[in-house]
Design a protein with these regions (language model features):
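Conserved Walker A/P-loop ATP-binding site and its immediately adjacent core
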Residues: 6-22, 26-47, 86, 246-247
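Conserved helicase ATPase core of P-loop NTP-dependent helicases/translocases
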Residues: 41-45, 238-242, 247-292, 311
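Post-DEXD/H (motif II) to motif III coupling segment of the RecA-like Helicase ATP-binding lobe
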Residues: 84-140
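Walker B catalytic acidic pair
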Residues: 77-78
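Conserved interdomain hinge at the start of the Helicase C-terminal
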Residues: 17-18, 156, 162-163, 211-251
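Conserved segment of the helicase C-terminal RecA-like domain
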Residues: 318-347
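Conserved two-lobed SF2 helicase motor
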Residues: 52-73, 82, 274-290
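A short beta-strand element within the Helicase C-terminal
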Residues: 72-74, 283, 290-306, 311-312, ...
Length: 385
């Protein structure tokens, strides 16, 4: 399995491998499995460019997992998405001689990447730094903007959250299972001699505080304000924003909005319009995390942070896709003094970042040099909520 930066052109690597195999055996059959229609279309274009359609076919995993096939080489793009009870059957349904898995970030929050490793060990890993050094990606600098604001509401939510969380012995899995599964909750109450009605109230109060606390940091109005400031200072750039929700993406109010509530045809038109403009803004929630190829992107703004290395790697990859002479910027907006910084630290995939405040942001946007700082790269935060 190839473990590489999302934008280090995993597709090109796979195409090179297919070409080598075809030279040795012109009758070789390759099945390429992808998670989305967008990626299927991108692969099709690459296969046409390289005259490989006679040896290869592409299927979306939802369909591929239902149809037994025999192939010489099975390629699974974005293989980190396979470890579900349904999709993992792909390894049994498809009979293959060789397996190539492609991913930008294998590590998952649920640890289920271990299931993938049963079928495919990591054969190579390309870091962002190595990819940049070899000219496979464009240089990208991340600015982590620490935003100061009134935390009275957050601190009150945090206090209540911790009070409810202590009821579950500070065990995140127990608390979350109690929310999701009433049968688990009943069993847990019985085993611990707890009142079911009281446990139910604690469960939903804990979940409510968890949601409100996350909403406070990820959808804070000051992030919208600062995102607009960055956009106005980079009017000559192609800019992609990542928000927590569709509503937040729409609140930015500058440029285009791409989201799942619009029809596929509408989104295709919006994306095509954005691609053809020399400078523009595309606001998204999660719709551009995977499968969007816009090498001309020069600026990204992340308004919504979580602990996922996969999501961070995907978003990083959107920005540093290679384009001659390009130097990209990524602005990650964080509410200072909250757990959001811990989420960012757990998700970071590169050492090429600086931590700045709002005054330093103004200097950067004006093109001035700044004194910056980094955190200890060996430090670790074990909790993710």
């Amino acid at each position: 399995m190839k473990h590489a930066l999302a934008s280090a052109d995993k597709t090109k690597l796979a195409i090179d491998i297919i070409n080598l195999l075809v030279k040795k055996n012109q009758d070789i059959l390759v099945l390429i499995v992808v998670p989305t229609e967008v990626l299927k279309d991108q692969w099709f274009e690459k296969l046409v460019e390289n005259n490989l359609l006679s040896n290869c076919k592409i299927e979306i995993i939802n369909s591929a997992v239902k149809t037994p096939q025999v192939v010489d080489l099975l390629i699974i793009d974005e293989i980190h998405g396979v470890p579900s009870e349904h999709f993992v059957k792909i390894f049994e349904v498809i009979k293959y001689k060789l397996l190539l898995g492609l991913t930008g970030t294998l590590e998952r929050l649920d640890g289920r990447e271990a299931l993938i490793k049963k079928y495919a060990s990591v054969c190579d890993k390309v870091t962002i730094e190595e990819a940049e050094k070899n000219g496979w990606v464009s240089p990208l600098k991340e600015y982590v903007v620490m935003i100061k604001t009134d935390l009275t509401e957050y601190n009150e939510l945090n206090k209540r959250f911790n009070a409810y969380f202590s009821y579950f012995g500070w065990d995140f899995q127990t608390a979350m299972k109690s929310v999701q599964d009433v049968f688990f909750r009943r069993k847990w109450c019985k085993e611990n001699n707890l009142n079911f009605k009281e446990a139910t109230a604690m469960t939903y109060d804990w979940m409510r505080c968890l949601r409100l606390r996350k909403q406070f940091v990820q959808s804070h109005p000051k992030k919208i304000e600062i995102a607009r400031k960055i956009i106005n200072a980079r009017k000559d750039k192609k800019i992609l924003t990542f928000s927590a929700t569709i509503a937040d993406a729409e609140k930015i109010g500058i440029g285009l909005v791409l989201h799942s509530k619009q029809s596929k045809k509408q989104n295709e038109k919006i994306l095509e319009k954005f691609k053809t403009q020399s400078s523009s803004v595309l606001n998204t929630s999660k719709s551009c995390d995977v499968g969007v190829d816009i090498p001309e992107l020069e600026c990204g703004i992340i308004l919504s942070v979580d602990s996922s290395k996969i999501r961070k790697g995907q978003r990083y990859g959107r920005l540093c896709r290679f384009s001659p002479g390009k130097k990209a910027e990524l602005f990650t907006l964080i509410i200072a003094g909250t757990q959001e910084f811990g989420w960012w630290r757990n998700s970071k995939t590169s050492s090429n970042y600086v931590i700045i405040d709002e005054e330093q942001l103004d200097d950067i946007l004006a093109g001035n040099e700044i004194q910056s700082r980094k955190i200890d790269d060996n430090s670790n935060i074990n909790f993710r909520f």
